[in-house]
Amino acid sequence: METAEPVSYEFPGHAVGAVAPRRMMGSNVGHNFPFYTNPTGGYTLPFHQSSSPAYSFGHTLNHHHHHHHHHPGYQHYFVAGQQPINPQPVRLSSEPPSIQQIPDIRPAKNAVNRVARDPLMKIEHNGASQQPPGAQSSSNEEGAQGKSSSSNEVEFSTEVDILMKAIQAKASAQSPGVQSLPPLQQLTHGGSNGYPQSYSMPVTTPRCTVMVEEAPSRSGKKRKYACTLPQCGKSFAQKTHLDIHMRAHTGDKPFVCKEPSCGQRFSQLGNLKTHQRRHTGEKPFSCDICQKRFAQRGNVRAHKITHQHAKPFTCLLDDCGKQFTQLGNLKSHQNKFHATTLRNLTMKFSQVTEGDHMSPQDRKLWEYFATLYKNSNKGIKGRGKDRRISPTSRSDPGSESRRRIEPLSSTDDKMRRASYGDTSMYNGGSSSDDDDAEPYFIERQAH
């Protein structure tokens, strides 16, 4: 076995000599214990934080001699001839219990609020700032991989979405009785309450338990089939609806479009049938006033608003007062013409704490956005770029005045129809095909 050569570590305040590990000549030496040839346990000892500063091996390393077996500087890292112990680390009763990650379960978007992960994200960023440079680089690489893997998904990050995240975060913090659940991936078996010490457990509500007492479904049936996954507890009147809901957790999409060069997958058969109408051009639903036909029943309901000359969505920012027939058009208008006002409101609302006085105008805007975009975490889509499923046909010159806008099928259908028991994003109806309220045609001004 080769001898070790001293190298110097330059620590602030003092320089200590350390022994650099060298490559071992014998092939029978375990990789986990490079300094020992005697038999040791086949496990890695857990790291226990000592009272001395990190990387401090003691002054004895300055006298680099060749007797490594009983070197006091490595007693916290390698123990020779130790008897086999319990793989679980021994801890004092005063120490907090160890945190163990539960299996990675994909959360159902209809049962979990994404805004609730912001506090945990801040804690993770603070902890990452104290990591060594090597750990930071590795975490950055993992973040880049995660970002690239989710680059195909539609992200809603407009000014309205950012404002709604701030409002929903404050609303959940100030109203613990109706607080949304934290994401399933970040739940840990920490203390007695199942949460890590840095995250306080929300107040238990009837919706947070597995066996819940919820109101009957719209059909009047009792919701007796409940989701058994941790911290979900949604219940349904039919077992089929529960099976569909479970696919939102697992990500299973058993229904595949058989159209050549398509192959998109869906979690519900109804979503597949709706998607197939885009290939076939079938439009089974018609307006009883003008006989205009649509592929989805919900689009007929949105279209009828144009016959009623009703514009129920009004912009209250900057005393605008402009009215719109569809919520998506109002959102696009606010993002385009009131971006500065939205940013100012986001800054103001994010700094609001419980007990602070809020002016009547700010309170009105708070309630206005909280009610108008209450389902924005599911994706209220406005008129934006790159939102079409296929290029617009240019054979008809008159088609520029009226353009057909269709959503991306796989991602938007997943957000729009998380489960049968969920509500629609626009009108509170069912998320099935008959009650889809997706805007189908959008008027465009000729330039």
From Swiss-Prot:
Q: Knockout: what is the outcome?
A: Completely blocks ochratoxin A (OTA) production, and repressed the OTA cluster genes at the transcriptional level. Alters the MAPK pathway and cellular iron homeostasis. Significantly upregulates antioxidant genes and downregulates oxidative phosphorylation genes.
Q: Write down any Gene Ontology CC term.
A: nucleus
Q: Where is the composition biased (Polar residues)?
A: 140-155, 421-431
Where in or outside the cell it occurs: the entry states: Nucleus
A GO molecular-function annotation: zinc ion binding
What ranges of residues constitute the C2H2-type zinc fingers? 225-249, 255-279, 285-307, 313-338
- Residues of the signal sequence? none
- Provide the alphabetized UniProt keywords: Metal-binding, Nucleus, Repeat, Transcription, Transcription regulation, Zinc, Zinc-finger
Matches recorded under Gene3D superfamilies = Classic Zinc Finger (3.30.160.60)
Report whether Chaperone shows up as a keyword of the record. no
Give the Low complexity compositional bias ranges: 127-139
**Ranges annotated as biased composition (Basic and acidic residues):** 397-416
Q: Where is this region: Disordered?
A: 125-155, 174-199, 377-447
Stored InterPro entries: Znf_C2H2_sf (IPR036236), Znf_C2H2_type (IPR013087)
What superkingdom does the record give?
Answer: Eukaryota
* Primary localization: nucleus
Q: What does this protein do?
A: Transcription factor that acts as a positive regulator of ochratoxin A (OTA) biosynthesis via controlling the expression of antioxidant genes and oxidative phosphorylation genes.
Name the record gives this protein: Transcription factor azf1
Q: What is the originating organism of this protein?
A: Aspergillus niger (strain ATCC MYA-4892 / CBS 513.88 / FGSC A1513)
Report the gene name.
Answer: azf1
